[in-house]
Structures are given as structure tokens and as C-alpha cells.
């Protein structure tokens, strides 16, 4: 669904133990890079232990971010992925602004969130987001809505693109 290819540079924001970092590292290969960002040093230590076991530590680079900035290099990433993270952000505006700085022009910001419009999703409302709410929050940034992918049983995949002239 993410259309990753060899050589891509991807950021896994809120990477945790690296579940998605490892899977994406296999897609981008040795010519690509995964910036695995988290605000907890302990999670980054756990993540890198997992990456060493899987022999992808040369592809995955841990980055200790803050609640307002994932600390990505400027204009460095083709895609930024947040899985069940955006709704947890203490400073969503500031974090989104900082993430956009890390995206290359035309780069994609991908949010995976539990569907707030679906009462059958057995997650507390504060841990879900509607598509309309996500679009509203992204509208104040230099992003355009690209598409929504509904292949997961309980979550949306919402893809936004950074303006090519940003």
C-alpha cells in the first residue's frame, strides 16, 4: 500500500520497538534508509537491538525526537509513516510542521489511524480519528490530500503530499 522501492528514504515516527521499521527496511534495501524516531531512548535501544538481530542496523538510523519535532534531516525523506501515533501527539501542529520540513518536495506523509466514524471498531473514541478530522488538521499545512486506502479491518491509511514547491 505504501509503494516503497529500493533506495527510498523513510521515517517511522513513533517507531517504538521497530515493527514497521524492520519491514520497511526490507523494502528500501541497502541503498535506502529508515529514520526510526521516538521520544523514548529506551524504545530506540530496543529497536536497534531488534535491527541488529535482523541485520538491518546499517539501514535503520535511530533518532531521538521531542514531542514537537522528530528531528529529521531537512528535505531528506520520501515518506513519513505514523501508525496509531498522530492522535497521541501532544503538539500535533508543531510536530506536523517539523515533519513537513523533513519531507522532500512531493514527499508523502502517511497516517494510519483507527476509524473514528466506525462504532464497530472496539477502541476508545480518544484513540480514533475520522477522515474528516485528519483532513481538517492537515489543511493548515502545505500538504494536499492524495488518497485514502481502506485495506485494514479497523484503520484508515491516509496519504498526504508535500507541495512540490515547498
Label the model's feature ranges:
Residues 11-70:
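Class I SAM-dependent methyltransferase SAM/SAH-binding core
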Residues 1-9:
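Conserved alpha-helix/loop element of class I SAM-dependent methyltransferases that forms part
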Residues 141, 146-166:
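Core SAM-dependent methyltransferase catalytic element
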Amino acid at each position: 500500500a505504501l509503494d516503497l522501492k529500493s533506495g527510498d528514504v523513510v521515517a517511522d515516527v513513533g517507531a517504538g520497538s521497530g515493527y514497521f521499521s524492520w519491514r520497511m527496511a526490507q523494502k528500501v534495501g541497502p541503498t535506502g534508509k529508515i529514520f526510526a524516531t521516538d521520544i523514548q531512548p529506551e524504545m530506540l535501544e530496543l529497536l536497534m537491538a531488534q535491527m541488529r538481530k535482523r541485520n538491518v542496523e546499517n539501514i535503520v538510523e535511530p533518532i531521538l525526537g521531542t514531542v514537537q519535532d522528530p528531528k529529521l534531516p531537512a528535505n531528506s525523506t520520501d515518506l513519513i509513516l505514523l501508525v496509531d501515533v498522530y492522535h497521541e501527539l501532544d503538539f500535533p501542529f508543531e510536530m506536523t510542521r517539523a515533519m513537513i520540513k523533513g519531507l522532500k518536495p512531493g514527499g508523502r506523509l502517511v497516517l494510519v489511524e483507527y476509524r473514528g466514524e466506525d462504532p464497530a471498531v472496539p477502541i476508545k473514541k480518544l484513540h480514533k480519528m475520522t477522515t474528516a478530522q485528519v483532513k481538517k488538521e492537515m489543511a493548515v499545512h502545505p500538504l494536499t490530500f492524495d488518497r485514502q486506502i481502506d485495506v485494514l479491518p479497523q484503520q484508515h491509511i491516509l496519504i498526504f503530499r508535500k507541495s512540490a514547491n515547498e
